[in-house]
């Protein structure tokens, strides 16, 4: 980097431009879109032009169609970043994608009725957030993905507060209630009380 930087192609610059482009894209996406990224390799020493740099990203959206549109835009941003810096671009998936969750309304309604029968009163309709492979399942068969509150305070998933809440008496009580509601919903299916 000191003697002839003009002869090097800085792969880290390409990654930085990719992040800048994705950051600019954020103002043009719908509220359901989430874009997360991290640089996993950016060079080996400050005095050496990085000849290789890598990053990993997660892209999420409310529907597969929106996600496909976002991914196409991101691919173009990556191509532009490589073109701007003279770098070579390689893209690959490091995990299988997750489809959006399609909640089966009849199953969801039956589950909510079973919760009410078990004494849970504060019930909200289907809430489809985050991403999980249960979305892929929901495109093949009737699916619900219920949540039950395990705290009297709002919690954020994947947090220390959430982890601590899982070992409380309320959490254990709600786990049992949820399991019973699922079992009763399964009985409703077996007894043909729900149209799938």
Question: Would you name each region that the model predicts?
Answer:
Residues 85, 190-193:
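Long, hydrophobic, amphipathic alpha-helical segments used as structural scaffolds
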């Amino acid at each position: 980097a000191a003697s002839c930087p003009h002869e090097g192609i800085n792969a880290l610059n390409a990654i930085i431009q990719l992040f800048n482009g994705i950051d600019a894209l954020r103002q043009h996406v719908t509220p359901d879109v989430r874009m997360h990224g991290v640089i996993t390799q950016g060079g080996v020493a400050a005095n050496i032009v990085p000849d290789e740099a890598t990053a990993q990203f997660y892209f999420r959206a409310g529907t597969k169609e929106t996600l496909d549109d976002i991914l196409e835009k991101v691919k173009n941003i990556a191509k532009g970043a490589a073109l701007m810096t003279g770098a070579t671009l390689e893209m690959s998936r490091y995990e299988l994608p997750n489809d959006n969750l399609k909640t089966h309304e009849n199953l969801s309604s039956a589950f909510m009725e079973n919760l009410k029968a078990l004494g849970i009163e504060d019930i909200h309709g289907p809430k489809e957030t985050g991403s999980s492979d249960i979305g892929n399942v929901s495109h093949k068969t009737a699916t619900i993905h219920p949540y039950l509150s395990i705290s009297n305070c709002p919690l954020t998933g994947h947090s220390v507060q959430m982890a601590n809440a899982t070992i409380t008496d309320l959490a254990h009580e709600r786990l049992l209630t949820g399991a019973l509601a699922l079992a009763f919903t399964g009985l409703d299916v077996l007894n043909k009380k729900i149209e799938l």
